[in-house]
């Protein structure tokens, strides 16, 4: 079972790295002014989406930690 956990953990680590890259790219878009001229609701939806990605990353980190402890 620990081999399965190890394999799953490695896959989740790769996915987490990808999510972190996308999160940073989206955050940088806003700081670079890419949303300039957009409506307030659009900007708020963008912010909500970025925060949802951050929350998903935290949940994924928690799962990875749990899998690591069960190895």
Language-model-detected regions and their locations in the chain:
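Short, charge-rich amphipathic interface segments used for partner binding and complex assembly
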Residues: 11, 17-21, 25-70
């Amino acid at each position: 079972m620990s081999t399965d956990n190890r394999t799953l953990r490695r896959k989740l680590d790769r996915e987490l790295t990808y999510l972190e890259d996308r999160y940073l790219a989206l955050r940088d878009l806003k700081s670079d002014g890419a949303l300039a001229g957009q409506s307030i609701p659009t900007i708020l939806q963008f912010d909500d989406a970025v925060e949802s990605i951050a929350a998903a990353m935290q949940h994924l980190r928690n799962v990875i930690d749990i899998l690591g402890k069960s190895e």
